[in-house]
């Protein structure tokens, strides 16, 4: 029953994996974000319409008809793999064209990300005075540190920083909302990612009997071959941790050149891992096991690179929250009825599940 419900859930978008951006009703909110990472702009009004105006033009265009923007049930706007060119104004209007909420978003170029690790003695960029049609201060506005990506054992944490410009006596603005149509090339005008070592105790309240994904991979059975693994639910906005045969993979080792058999993708915050040799790879999001990738010899040329199967084991609560989001009310109702009428003897008992998918 649980496996069936999970397969139903997997057919729906993993909205929980995307960053939710909110703004008070009737307000205008300004955000700096990173290109390449999905976000959802909240509106929460039935049958609302979304309009967009880029930083290069004043004309509003309907977002509902664009391939890179999708209006979700409830009228929130999903932006998949946003580009720097999508920097601009996003306006949510009701059916009378009255403003419900408005976002000014600067999607800063992830390809320009400046990366430093505190424990390697690397320093982030400092403040810099520039002349951009007048004297301004360019600086980095930092998000809070994310949680440590491991507990009990040594781990790492990261924080994101965004490029901001401040004029004398004026409120700071994200760099490319400030510059708009101006074409300026300067190495200081870019976002940042800072890393450092950490160690924290485990949360004893964390649940351990939840499903996680398991994949069998056949991509490493030839010399000089490699595979690109993707951790479900991971993003640059969340703590992510990888292990190879139970040994931790760290940003410090990678940035210092000590890791040669794996490459964590910096621009996705570790969501993707490039591997060059067979091993059992496991990924964790917010300290919780999400997926395991098992090396398996190729049995036939026609076999898919990912082979699904199901077996029992432990997992954690991140995927439970995803399940609650993706299951429809009707599925929950039917599931509850079956549990009450058909599966009454086993209802209420915790069972661990491993879900293996293509």
From Swiss-Prot:
Coiled coil: none
Cytoplasmic side: 344-358
Record SUPFAM superfamilies: Immunoglobulin
GO CC terms, sorted: membrane
Superkingdom of the organism of origin: Eukaryota
Cellular localisation: Membrane
Segments on the Extracellular face: 18-322
InterPro entries assigned: FAM187A/B, Ig-like_dom_sf
Transmembrane segments: 323-343
Coarse class of the protein's main subcellular location: membrane
Membrane topology: Single-pass type I membrane protein
Signal peptide feature range: 1-17
Glycosylated residues, chain numbering: 127
Key words of the record: Glycoprotein, Membrane, Signal, Transmembrane, Transmembrane helix
Family: Belongs to the FAM187 family.
Protein name: Protein FAM187B
The gene coding this protein: Fam187b
């Amino acid at each position: 029953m649980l496996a069936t419900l999970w397969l139903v859930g997997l057919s729906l978008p993993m909205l929980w994996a995307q960053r939710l951006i909110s703004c008070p009703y009737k307000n205008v909110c300004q955000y700096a974000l990173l290109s390449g990472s999905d976000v959802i702009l909240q509106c929460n009004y039935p049958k609302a319409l979304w309009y967009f105006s880029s930083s290069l033009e004043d004309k509003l265009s309907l977002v509902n008809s664009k391939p890179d923007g999708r209006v979700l049930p409830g009228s929130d706007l999903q932006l998949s793999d946003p580009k720097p060119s999508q920097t601009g104004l996003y306006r949510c209007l009701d059916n009378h064209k009255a403003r419900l909420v408005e976002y000014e978003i600067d999607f800063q170029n992830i390809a320009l990300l400046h990366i430093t690790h505190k424990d390697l003695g690397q320093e982030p960029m400092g403040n810099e005075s520039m002349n951009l049609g007048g004297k301004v201060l360019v600086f980095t506005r930092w998000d809070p540190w994310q949680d440590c990506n491991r507990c009990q054992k040594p781990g790492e944490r990261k924080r994101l920083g965004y490029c901001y410009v401040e004029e004398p006596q004026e409120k700071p603005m994200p760099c490319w909302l400030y510059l708009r149509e101006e074409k300026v090339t300067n190495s200081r005008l870019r976002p940042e990612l800072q890393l450092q070592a950490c160690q924290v105790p485990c949360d004893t309240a964390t649940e351990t009997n939840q499903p996680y994904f398991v994949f069998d991979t056949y991509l490493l059975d030839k010399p000089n071959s490699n595979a690109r693994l993707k951790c479900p639910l991971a993003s640059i906005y969340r703590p992510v941790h990888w292990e190879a045969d139970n040994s931790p993979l760290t940003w410090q080792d990678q940035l210092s050149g000590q890791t040669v058999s794996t490459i964590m993708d910096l621009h996705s915050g570790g969501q993707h891992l490039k591997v060059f040799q067979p091993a059992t790879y496991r990924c964790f999001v917010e300290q919780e096991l999400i997926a395991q990738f098992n090396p398996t010899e190729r049995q036939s040329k026609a076999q898919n690179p990912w082979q699904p199967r199901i077996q029992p084991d432990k997992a954690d609560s991140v995927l439970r929250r995803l399940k609650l989001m993706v299951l429809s009310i009707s599925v929950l109702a039917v599931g509850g009825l079956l549990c009450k009428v058909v599966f009454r003897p086993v209802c209420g008992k915790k069972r661990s599940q491993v879900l293996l998918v293509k």
